[in-house]
Amino acid sequence: MVNFPPEIQCFLQLGENFSLPHINTPILTIEFIKHIECNLRKLSPASRIPIREKLKSIIKNIPSYSFPRNSHNDWLTRLYLTAKNFLQNNKDLILTRADKGNVTVALDKFDYLNKVGDLLRDENTYTIINKDPTKKLISNLKELLSRWKNHGYISNTTYKSLLFTDGILPRAYGLPKIHKINIPFRLIVSSINSPLYSLALFLHKIMIKNFPTASSHINNSFDLVQNLADVHLDDDSLLISLDAISLFTNIPTDLALSSVSSRWSFIRDVCDLPESEFLSAVRFVLNSTFFTFNNIIYKQTFGTPMGSPLSPIIADIVLQDLEEKALNTLRFTPRG
């Protein structure tokens, strides 16, 4: 049991988004460039050049910039250094955020690895892969994009923006559900900078912009209140709420492809890809469910890949189809 000094607790309660005073200019410069380049990837190569030119002078001036000093910044800097030293001396601790709520959680590293490991030991959902599939993924991606470019489906600029030649596999981590008994974990997979991230985002943008939303779609709680304002219920009416458990890992690939294919008419005129090529790319992304945790490579054996930009829209349209089919089987008309 580790006892956290009050000043360490105070510092950690600031949260991960709190802006701390900068004490390491070289690291600040590198991080600044990394964030800029990460966002520039979203633009066309021609658009990146003038932005880089404008940023050159800013980057050059960072080392000579004198950041303001005051008692608050000095106090925060001392707290930061104290907390950093404390964590370096307690390497069995892991800091993360809670699954819900703006809360920083300190975990025992052994317990964290065990609990996340328990999730990954579900043989019906995950399997360990002995050989790194990254090179094969990149090779298959290049083959797909080259075929598209050679047939004139995409431009050379789009080809370059979608091709990842040095990507890494998606990375998994766990977030504690501190609001539940025994504090179970939610498995999260981050696919940013993975080989198929840009392709998945490309497909996602086409679908999200053109697929119609369900008539039952609610944007937020305010929209819900507005929709319910004029609904009058009888005394014997029932209000039900349904929750999907582990949605992404329970959607069959063939069902996902069927839902996309049935909506092809909405994107046919705005997409230069033939339906067969578009569906082939969707299948490629959905079947590439590799990720790493604690230096072990896993493959999700069923469902849509967690962490992929493509999975949310796929889950949405599959649920739309399920909702429509379920409502059509009812012997009465539900209200709402």
Set out the residue ranges of the language-model regions:
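Short, solvent-exposed loop/turn segments at secondary-structure junctions
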Residues: 180, 195, 245-247
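Beta-strand-loop-alpha "switch" segments that mediate conformational coupling across diverse proteins
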Residues: 203
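Catalytic nucleotidyl-transfer cores of nucleotide-processing enzymes
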Residues: 191, 195, 237
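Conserved polymerase palm-domain catalytic core
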Residues: 206, 216-218, 222-226, 230-336
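Conserved catalytic motifs of the protein kinase core domain
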Residues: 171, 184, 235-237
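Non-catalytic, polymerase-adjacent accessory regions of viral genome-replication enzymes
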Residues: 1-172
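Short helix/loop capping segments that flank catalytic or ligand/cofactor-binding pockets
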Residues: 104-106, 115-116, 183-186, 197-199, ...
